[in-house]
From Swiss-Prot:
There are 2 substrate-binding sites: the catalytic A site, and the non-catalytic B site that may play a role in the transfer of substrate or product between the active site and the solvent. Alternatively, the B site may bind allosteric effectors. PANTHER family: ASPARTATEAMMONIA/ARGININOSUCCINATE/ADENYLOSUCCINATE LYASE, FUMARATE HYDRATASE, MITOCHONDRIAL. GO terms for cellular component: cytoplasm. The record marks 329 as: Important for catalytic activity. The active site is at residues 186, 316. Keywords: Cytoplasm, Lyase, Tricarboxylic acid cycle. Substrate binds at residues 96-98, 127-130, 137-139, 185, 317, 322-324. It catalyses: (S)-malate = fumarate + H2O. This is Fumarate hydratase class II 1. Its EC number is 4.2.1.2. One of its GO terms (molecular function) is fumarate hydratase activity.
Amino acid sequence: MSRTETDSLGTIEVPDDAYWGAQTQRSLENFAIGGQRMPLAVIHALALIKKAAARVNDHLGELPPEVARLIEQAADEVLAGRHDEHFPLVVWQTGSGTQTNMNVNEVIAGRANELAGNPRGGKSPVHPNDHVNRAQSSNDSFPTAMHIAAAKAVHEQLLPAIAELSGGLAEQSARHASLVKTGRTHLMDATPITFGQELSAFVAQLDYAERAIRAALPAVYQLAQGGTAVGTGLNAPKGFADAIAAEIAAESGLPFVAAPNKFAALAGHEPLVILSGALKSLAVALMKIANDLRLLGSGPRAGFAEVKLPANEPGSSIMPGKVNPTQCEALSMLACQVMGNDSTISFAASQGHLQLNVFKPVIVYNLLESIRLLADGCRNFNKHCVAGLEPDAQRMADLLERGLMLVTALNPHIGYDKAAEIAKKAYAEGTTLRAAALQLGYLDEAQFDEWVRPEQMLEAGHHG
């Protein structure tokens, strides 16, 4: 069953049970591309905008109070997720997001008219353009929704997830603060380090990334709403931009404000590019963490084998008993995806022409995917890898005892050249540093035992 809806192009048949109208139906028919639906976070952000706009327009005398109440009620239902199935459009549409903006306008109007006792859909008493979209353009509403969706996702999903992973690593770092092992640079043996110190670097890297993400947020809080079509604010009443930003801030609990330059807010997306760059920095840190733990857990008999990674599942379909570092692999793959998303976002943001960037849907799609992947990745990695991480203390001690770079502690006492000679002799003859040093006669047993003490080589100020 269908009903007839109209727009400026004429009439079109719409499924009878759909809340959307003519423009959404045309988009469905004309843009059957891929399966990437517009993220619901964007839909819900647009619904929040429509609710806030109805309230502000009511206060400013731009809408009849009864129409404003109907819009608010319908928008609240959308925000609650009650009509998610009525937003079927894909990302691959007009670059301004107009089709999705109209999808939201039509669904809210269609539901509002039903609430008023009329048949589903239609344009009376609530019109999707004249009432729901009052004082707005897709050109300012969609970028505003992009900022709202991104900021909410960072606060609600990503920051708590970073805190979980950072906390898990910090706990492991504290637990193993005195477990001495071989440090490595260039993948070669270096001077000693504790396992706790090694893990503390991961915590600090996450902290740098988190601070970069938080530093990007103030610009994301600046909203394009009120700029309307080209940034001038045409057809928006005086004071609308500040009023709707305040309304959105109150509803969301985040400090949104009106962007100081609406022309830039429509034509460019620097705040989201900066946020994406910060997300990439987190991906870089996660890649490092995953790769390091994968190396340390390599083996169990022919690798580093210093760390036992939790076994989440059998690792091979052909090699019985094999366990693979699957959590590290999953985390590193999603880090790659985030880096790729950042490249897409950067290129898309560079393609604004004159007064409008028309790559908005692909920007927000990739940005929200990055946030979701990073949040899920941090939580999953902490729960299924970091929490169950077990260092092999005996293996660490064995490798440390055999390490040649302990000779570095002798530098202040016998000089670099003699210390290097000891290391080369020990390596060439397969003997210990102690034996090589004594054979060369550069020091006696007591001196070696006093000066070469790994547990005292862990901080500045030690000279053996």
